[in-house]
Amino acid sequence: MEALVYTFLLVSTLGIIFFAIFFREPPKVPNKKIK
């Protein structure tokens, strides 16, 4: 059960960070840094 909780926490944290960066810097020019 601990693995499930840790996985969920990791995914949610990554999602929050991704959303924060995405909304902080609106993609005006398509940057291909991550992909």
UniProtKB/Swiss-Prot annotation:
Protein name: Photosystem II reaction center protein T
Assigned GO CC terms: chloroplast thylakoid membrane; photosystem II reaction center
Swiss-Prot/TrEMBL GO biological process terms: photosynthesis
Family: Belongs to the PsbT family.
Subunit comment: PSII is composed of 1 copy each of membrane proteins PsbA, PsbB, PsbC, PsbD, PsbE, PsbF, PsbH, PsbI, PsbJ, PsbK, PsbL, PsbM, PsbT, PsbY, PsbZ, Psb30/Ycf12, at least 3 peripheral proteins of the oxygen-evolving complex and a large number of cofactors. It forms dimeric complexes.
Keyword annotations from UniProtKB, A to Z: Chloroplast, Membrane, Photosynthesis, Photosystem II, Plastid, Thylakoid, Transmembrane, Transmembrane helix
Keyword Membrane assigned: yes
Subcellular location, record wording: Plastid, Chloroplast thylakoid membrane
Bilayer-spanning residue ranges: 3-23
Membrane protein topology class: Single-pass membrane protein
A Pfam family the protein falls into: PsbT
HAMAP family named among the record's database cross-references: PSII_PsbT
Function: Found at the monomer-monomer interface of the photosystem II (PS II) dimer, plays a role in assembly and dimerization of PSII. PSII is a light-driven water plastoquinone oxidoreductase, using light energy to abstract electrons from H(2)O, generating a proton gradient subsequently used for ATP formation.
Domain of life: Eukaryota
Family annotation (PANTHER family): PHOTOSYSTEM II REACTION CENTER PROTEIN T (PTHR36411:SF2), PTHR36411
Organism name: Amborella trichopoda
